[in-house]
């Protein structure tokens, strides 16, 4: 269930001085495996300096384009991002998991209504996939709000401008530059004043869904702004592009727990310390449990508690209903009972 496929890097495109777009060559036999919904992400794995490093990156290509690409922005002390932006070459291979994620563009009743996309920094990556797909495959309007420090640090700037020229009536772009004003676009970070102005400007649009992706605080603030406007929470989709601090500390738990793990059609039972996350307990024993970011952001490690109880150090991915139904982020979950049974699902 946690299968990795070796894909060749077909093309590397430099987006800014610190970011690249990686386009993979997908063999015909794997086309179906790597078909994706706009907004999904890929988990990449590479051996760097003798260690296997795994990271999640959102797909930035549109469903309509027939390509599979992700964008990577170098971050301070980022092992994988430094490798991808400075060492990776065309023709190299990377191990890649099939697309996954719940931050996607839906083709249902709300999929026929206009959408508003909020992003900041590298949070624009899934928005590019959603915007390109919506513009090419539907007739809805897309309001695209993108915050960054300056025009020079804006990922996909030329492509965004080209889409704006291609769809002048349906693609409305608004930048918010915090450090360098540009044209008649907003100055400063995305805030309630900007959000209110956009709703006034596009009051005649037939709104369906709202998407927000970027730093934790911005995404939380945007969600609250939208809820205060009376927008149903089921029409607001969010994804975080940075890990937030833990909300609770369970690393001081005492004693051991008997863990029964259902994974890939097999059942394993073993004992572990309660002060280790359920995911780390499984990985330390060589079980191929699914994971990617290890920070409670990507949701690759979701499992369901079938018996016993667990508490999460933080959760900004699962809904209240999912938690009530027994789902956990295993990289953040600690057993609080002496026995626990969990199942990793596809």
Question: What role is predicted for each listed range?
Answer:
Residues 83-260:
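FNR/FR-type flavoprotein reductase catalytic core
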Residues 146, 176, 264-268, 273, ...:
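Short histidine
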